[in-house]
A protein has these predicted regions:
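ATP-binding N-lobe of GHMP and related small-molecule kinases
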Residues: 1-101, 119, 123, 127-128
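A broad detector of short, well-ordered amphipathic alpha-helices
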Residues: 69-70, 111, 132
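Short, small-residue alpha-helix embedded
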Residues: 107-120
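Short, well-structured alpha-helical segments that form the helix of a local strand-helix-strand
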Residues: 126-137
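Short conserved loop adjoining the S-adenosyl-L-methionine
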Residues: 143
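Single conserved hydrophobic/aromatic residue that forms the stacking wall/gate
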Residues: 146-155
Length: 155
């Protein structure tokens, strides 16, 4: 069984400006943010069966409402051309970032899911490609990917 665990860092916006609304309903933003030492852990495991998401926080949905589910499904659709949810993966969330607190926990979890699946599925997508996919989920997703990628390159 192959698995990858990644820290999923919270962030705080020091300055946030909404520049306009895009055709997809999301906003164009200008922001200055700071990553925090507070993080969730996202573990993605390859195993047989349907997509399963588990979470130690009972108030977090573990179905298609979860941004992690949406990230896995979007990557699957984008690279494999399939509209069905991906199979043969389990995603476990260990939450430390308070939900709905404006700290970007869900976006960061989605970003780490994209990074982990890129490795596990051996897609070899570069960060720019992953960022474009992540941007379809929300403006904070690519920022989380970029920050974590920078941290990993320092290790």
């Amino acid at each position: 069984m192959r698995a990858i665990s990644l820290p999923s860092f919270a962030k705080i916006n020091l300055d946030l400006r909404i520049l306009g609304t895009r055709p997809d309903g999301f906003h164009d933003l200008k922001t200055i943010f700071q990553s925090l030492a507070l993080f969730d852990t996202v573990t993605v495991t390859v195993r047989k069966g349907p997509l399963v998401i588990t979470c130690d926080e009972p108030d977090i949905p573990t179905d298609q409402r979860n941004l992690v589910w949406k990230a896995a499904s979007l990557l699957h659709r984008t690279v494999r051309g399939k509209s069905t949810p991906p199979r043969d993966i389990a995603i476990d969330l260990r939450k430390r970032v308070p939900s709905e607190a404006g700290l970007g926990g869900g976006s960061s979890n989605a970003a780490m899911t994209l990074l982990a699946l890129n490795r596990l599925w051996k897609l070899d997508l570069d960060l720019a490609s992953l960022s474009r996919i992540g941007a379809r989920l929300g403006a904070d997703v690519p920022r989380s990917e970029e920050h974590t990628s920078e941290l990993q390159s320092l290790a």
